[in-house]
């Protein structure tokens, strides 16, 4: 099948997974002996009730498995026939894919806000790789596998006037394309400082650590990483006394939303759909001219009219609507883009916020006070030592004098 259709590794892995699940469900029954009723029984097992799956996400899984079965069984029964001329064998004949009314599997409330993205980047631990991945995912709008195939050499930094940006070459379903990076630049640089193979420009940008050091991450690994943050890291933050209550409120709402790598592309493309023409958005997203994917992303999740009315009535301004909490903090001294929460420039160490300035002044004041205290302590010790030394010397001189002279001096 690989030779006939040039399937990618991930696609082949997906087909193998579908066949494995089918075989296990039917008690490891031979594929040659499977019937149409067996296939329908497996597919019907994927159905879910309205209560458990109101957005009908199971239909996507149903159709995905069915397409894998169609391809496999056509090859199994007619492998001597040209792939384009193979007919459906009886085992998968007359089993249609299902249609879903929803344009997207996500509800409007499922999408993260820019403030929630900021909170995630701030509290996702000390793993610079994960921060970099998340920032690049929402900055580039790339598919998961496109991001994972990026190598260090694929990122080129550029400067226009006093502004810095980057371009990254990605490989997708429609071929190669160049994507600009803006808000994620500080996170990319931060991760590259700690990258285990940062000197090797051919190394994967998002590689494994510890046992899998240097290896390209899989999309399954990325999914597991996001689940780890949802199930372990962020719930603990709600009990952390050092986390401000305002941040805890945002985290509490965020934990009710999906944590997966795919929803980041939905967020990114929905945001860019507000400012890019459809033809430009297609090129940016890596969609062909006949692709129906824009129907999934271009509906703005039903809130564009609401925002327009809020703006018309003066409740919000256009500037407020486009506010981006993830915009880098540009250094006024060297123009280096820094993370939004940065207090000092990563390049020239210039102070970037009033808090940092106040901390610097306080640190200097504290340093002077410590030096002054040490000076006074040293001087007190020195005075005591000199006083003791003078006392000893006077005692020695008196001891050398004749008693009658001392008696005469004291009389």
Please give the residue ranges for each predicted region.
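N-terminal core-binding DNA-recognition domain of tyrosine recombinases/integrases
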Residues: 1-106
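DNA breakage-rejoining catalytic core of tyrosine-based enzymes
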Residues: 98-118, 174-186, 199-203
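Basic, Lys/Arg- and aromatic-enriched nucleic-acid-binding interface segment
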Residues: 114-144
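Conserved tyrosine-mediated DNA breakage-rejoining catalytic core shared by Y-recombinases
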Residues: 140, 145, 149-189, 329, ...
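Active-site/catalytic core of tyrosine-dependent DNA strand-transfer enzymes
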Residues: 182-255
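Short, basic (Lys/Arg/His-rich) helix/loop patches that form interaction surfaces
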Residues: 223-283, 287-291, 299, 303, ...
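Catalytic-site neighborhood detector that most strongly recognizes the C-terminal catalytic loop/helix
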Residues: 285-322, 350-354
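Short Cys/His-rich micro-motifs in 6-15 aa windows
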Residues: 347-362
């Amino acid at each position: 099948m690989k030779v006939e259709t040039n399937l990618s590794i991930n696609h082949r892995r997906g087909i193998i997974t579908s066949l494995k699940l089918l075989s296990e469900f039917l008690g490891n029954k031979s594929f040659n002996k499977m019937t149409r009723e067996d296939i329908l029984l497996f597919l019907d097992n994927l159905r879910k009730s309205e209560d458990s799956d109101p957005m009908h996400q199971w239909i996507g899984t149903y159709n995905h498995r069915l397409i894998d079965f169609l391809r496999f069984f056509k090859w199994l029964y007619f492998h001597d026939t040209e792939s384009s001329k193979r007919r459906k064998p009886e085992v998968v004949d007359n089993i249609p894919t299902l249609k879903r009314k929803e344009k997207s599997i996500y509800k409007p409330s499922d999408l993260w806000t820019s403030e929630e993205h900021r909170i995630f980047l701030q509290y996702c631990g000390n793993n610079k790789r994960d921060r970099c991945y998340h920032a690049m995912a929402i900055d580039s709008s790339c598919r998961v596998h496109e991001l994972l195939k990026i190598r260090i050499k694929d990122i080129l930094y550029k400067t226009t006037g006093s502004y810095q940006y980057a371009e990254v070459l990605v490989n997708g379903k429609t071929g190669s394309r160049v994507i600009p990076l803006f808000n994620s630049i500080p996170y990319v640089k931060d991760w590259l400082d700690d990258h285990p193979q940062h000197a090797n420009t051919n190394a994967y940008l998002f590689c494994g650590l510890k046992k899998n050091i240097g290896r390209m991450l899989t999309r399954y690994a990325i999914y597991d990483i996001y689940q780890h943050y949802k199930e372990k890291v962020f719930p603990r933050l709600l009990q952390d006394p050092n986390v401000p209550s305002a941040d805890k409120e945002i985290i509490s709402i965020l934990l009710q939303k999906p944590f997966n790598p795919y929803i980041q592309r939905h967020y990114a493309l929905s945001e860019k759909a507000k400012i890019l023409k459809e033809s430009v958005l297609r090129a940016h997203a890596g969609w062909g001219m006949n692709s129906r994917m824009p129907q999934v992303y271009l509906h703005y999740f039903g809130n564009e009219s609401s925002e327009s009315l809020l703006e018309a009535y003066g409740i919000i301004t256009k500037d407020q609507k486009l506010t981006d909490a993830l915009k880098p903090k540009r250094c006024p001294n060297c123009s280096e883009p820094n993370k939004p929460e940065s207090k000092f420039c990563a390049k020239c160490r210039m102070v970037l916020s009033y808090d940092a300035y106040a901390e610097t002044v306080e640190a200097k004041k504290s340093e002077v006070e410590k030096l002054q205290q040490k000076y006074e302590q040293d001087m007190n010790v020195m005075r005591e030592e000199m006083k003791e030394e003078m006392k000893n010397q006077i005692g020695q001189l008196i001891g050398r004098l004749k008693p009658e002279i001392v008696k005469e001096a004291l009389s």
